[in-house]
């Protein structure tokens, strides 16, 4: 019963639309109507600016970290990745918004941080290296999700490997429109200020 309740809490936590809330509360903007229309951190950066983007990124990562460490908090004999997966599903399919959510990149990163900080550090290096190289958040996110799965293969954790594979597939599917733009050469690139 406790595990079922915590899975539900993890889902509801993951479903909190951080970007939408920040946009409406502080900027009187529905970010779904601007930029890419996505609820995630990348579109928040584009539409609402750096400070809002950083806040949303941190909060979305936290939405993954907290459920992932539920087994530590509540002394449960279950892998934290299951609660993390519930949070990811909540972020992608939020009940509060008719199940139309974000792409789960930041929340997935938070889940990995919660269950295996070493893997997180490795994929963080991969992410920022690719970001500065390609300047495309979408391509970076896709390749990092693949890198995350490959990285988990070097750890003795079959559950983490399986869920990381599913997360990779989910992130690729959620970026299908981005993939089309990458192929056509029309995907936006971010500009780094000197």
UniProtKB/Swiss-Prot annotation:
Keywords: Cell membrane, Lipid biosynthesis, Lipid metabolism, Membrane, Phospholipid biosynthesis, Phospholipid metabolism, Transferase, Transmembrane, Transmembrane helix. GO terms for molecular function: acyl-phosphate glycerol-3-phosphate acyltransferase activity. Probably interacts with PlsX. GO terms for biological process: phospholipid biosynthetic process. Its EC number is 2.3.1.275. Its main location: membrane. It comes from the Bacteria. NCBIfam families: glycerol-3-phosphate 1-O-acyltransferase PlsY. Pathway: Lipid metabolism; phospholipid metabolism. It catalyses: an acyl phosphate + sn-glycerol 3-phosphate = a 1-acyl-sn-glycero-3-phosphate + phosphate. This is Glycerol-3-phosphate acyltransferase. Pfam families: G3P_acyltransf. PANTHER family: GLYCEROL-3-PHOSPHATE ACYLTRANSFERASE-RELATED (PTHR30309:SF0), INNER MEMBRANE PROTEIN YGIH (PTHR30309). One of its GO terms (cellular component) is plasma membrane. The chain crosses the membrane at residues 3-23, 47-67, 78-97, 112-132, 153-173. It is a multi-pass membrane protein. Catalyzes the transfer of an acyl group from acyl-phosphate (acyl-PO(4)) to glycerol-3-phosphate (G3P) to form lysophosphatidic acid (LPA). This enzyme utilizes acyl-phosphate as fatty acyl donor, but not acyl-CoA or acyl-ACP. It is found in: Cell membrane. Belongs to the PlsY family.
